[in-house]
């Protein structure tokens, strides 16, 4: 999966930093420090984008086309959908599958964990490393 880069506006406050993502209307957060604000904005971007098909993600505005005011500054921030999903959408889901009875019997005799085997096979097939 690829990463999606968006310009993000950071605005220092008396206490902490406010953060806005102009290309994702209503996507904003804050943090007590710049580091915390960066972590929080990636989570906020994920919440905004999680129910949208990546092919329909809003197009990113060029950073030099974003208007800034006062102490605001802009940074390009990457949204990594795979990293977001691994962190926030790791809940197991049930899958129903069919295999020949003889294969099922052999696997059960050898105490094969079907869920574990399927996960490993899918990770391998998709070229994704386990983390």
Predicted region positions:
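A short, exposed loop/beta-hairpin motif centered on an aromatic-Gly-Thr core
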Residues: 25-34
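Short, proline-centered helix/strand-breaking motifs
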Residues: 22-25, 100
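Short, charged, surface-exposed hinge/linker loops at domain edges
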Residues: 1-5, 43-110, 116-131
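N-terminal segment of the canonical double-stranded RNA-binding domain
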Residues: 1-15, 20, 73
């Amino acid at each position: 999966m690829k990463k999606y880069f968006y310009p993000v506006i950071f605005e220092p406050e008396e206490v902490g930093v406010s953060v806005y993502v102009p290309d994702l209307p209503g996507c904003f957060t804050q943090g007590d420090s710049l580091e915390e604000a960066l972590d929080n904005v990636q989570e906020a971007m994920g919440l905004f984008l999680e129910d949208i098909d990546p092919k329909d993600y809003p197009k990113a505005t060029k950073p030099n086309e974003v208007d800034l005011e006062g102490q605001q500054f802009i940074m390009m921030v990457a949204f990594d959908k795979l990293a977001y999903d691994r962190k926030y959408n790791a809940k197991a889901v049930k899958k129903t599958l069919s295999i020949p009875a003889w294969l099922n019997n052999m696997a059960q005799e050898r105490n094969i964990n079907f869920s574990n085997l399927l996960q490993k096979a899918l990770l391998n097939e998709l070229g994704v490393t386990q983390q």
